[in-house]
């Protein structure tokens, strides 16, 4: 039986000049996208298979062009078929931060480069012709925070509205101005070391197609409160200080409050998403990270601005009932 997707892929590779080259699967992510490496004569490229309607490669192409225009390292798009959902991309290799850190690489040096890249991104003047990006506004942030009570701990409609009302009251304090470009998944799985490139161009950027404009602290929180690995407290503090030193106009107290709220919102979202990936998509591998995400969330909730959320969770999802999404049922 013929596989229409395989046939479409073969036609795309033929048109791009890579016909007949073996496509070796690469590690995937939590999306519907799949990746393959193709190599010949000492060179290689990466094929992104992003099947519509679940995926749309248009934002990836636009954001990649923007990042490259800003002097940062995003993969060059070598060929594209937007209708079929195929991209042929520059191959950045295998030196992801995740892999390097697991192999004992210099952790402070890698995080310093990542923070410097984030600073450069936020300092760069937006060039003309930038794509119109969605705003990371209140409704979008609420829609993510509610994933906790939609998937991890389903609650009756009245409690759901109560939870949302608390977030509506708190989130305005997270919206520090001016808004900036937010990549949203800025963490070690999506950063790759390019040692032959100077300065911040040595930090390759991946998985940025969901970029938005939003609060400046979001990507720093994403980097330093990583759902997949523990980061030493002193390193977190040093990297936060490095970031804040680059933006002396930011009021530190205001930023600290914003960052705590964004971190808690993000961790509520992650708990919901990891549970959804298991319950809906059969991807159990993300459940191993849930205890760490709860630890991060509980630390975030120590900020006074998050007291109402902390008290709500203590009532409806007390500490002894956490870390086990398989035991959650509707309250």
For each feature predicted by the language model, list its residue ranges:
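Conserved NTP-binding catalytic cores of kinases and kinase-like/nucleotidyltransferase enzymes
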Residues: 1-86, 180, 194-204, 314-331
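Catalytic activation segment of kinase domains across protein kinase-like and atypical kinase folds
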Residues: 191-223, 227-230
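Residue immediately N-terminal to the catalytic "proton-acceptor" Asp
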Residues: 184, 189
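ATP-binding pocket architecture of kinase catalytic cores
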Residues: 33-143, 147, 153-154, 176
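Active-site activation/catalytic loop segments of kinase-like enzymes and analogous catalytic loops
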Residues: 146-155, 216-250, 264-281, 293-301
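Secondary-structure capping and boundary motifs in well-ordered enzyme cores
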Residues: 140, 178, 183, 212-213, ...
